């Protein structure tokens, strides 16, 4: 089956909205644990209201003059672009052969949409891979250069002393986490968190590498014995902290940090609305097409206050 450039271009135009949403759908493994903010074009100020108000014994003269403040943080989304040459026949053949094997009777419009969906989902997969370690580089060429990931933002805040042990939003591990000490180490980490973060009845997520999670499972088995372990093979919460759930992610496998926070504090910014974002197919050479995409993407912590976030800096020999 041959798909013409015109058919691909028509599908791109017809399904533009769905295709622009596809990179986000392709990131669900990670962003299901975060909060997606749509309609963010370049920047939006986020943050929280701070201050206090206290009810005391009745007084006609007492006035509380302490101010209420908004601690603002900026969620930046960066406009990214890609122009990818590809041979439509090779992609179509792969999709069509797979459909035939599954007994699907696909029409040309279905194949065209699947070609575009395949390429667009790849964009989302690469953004997901670098959601922690990406570092903005204006002259870069990859997803890792497009925006500042959560680990990059964390390192910048540590460098600015806005995340620190003295403030209470940083915990520094004194030794490596292994299968022999993971339970005690991670419990100590959670115990160091503000009680307003871990003891306020809200659901909290512990973002970590799969290696750390596996070490915890092994140590948990050795610590509690075979019977309890076998009845709950996948220990998904931290012992003693039933509201703290492990979130082991492949894209955090080389991360120097763990993050203890809530889903609402992890912001992922996209636009998906403006004219700047588009997905088109153009033909400039015989047998070769160009897939052209532009879209916004960025991440940010809504707050780095200790009541919302505790960063665990892993031991580095």
Regions found by a protein language model. Name each.
Residues 94, 128, 215-217:
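Short helix/loop capping segments that flank catalytic or ligand/cofactor-binding pockets
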Residues 17-97:
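Assembly/oligomerization interface modules of large self-assembling protein complexes
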Residues 179-192, 226-232:
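Well-ordered, non-membrane alpha-helical segments in soluble/globular domains
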Residues 2-52, 148-176, 202, 210-317:
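Sequence/fold signature of self-assembling virion shell proteins
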Residues 97-188, 317:
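Alpha-helical scaffold segments that mediate packing/assembly in large oligomeric complexes
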Residues 189-198, 202:
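Short, basic/hydrophobic alpha-helical segments
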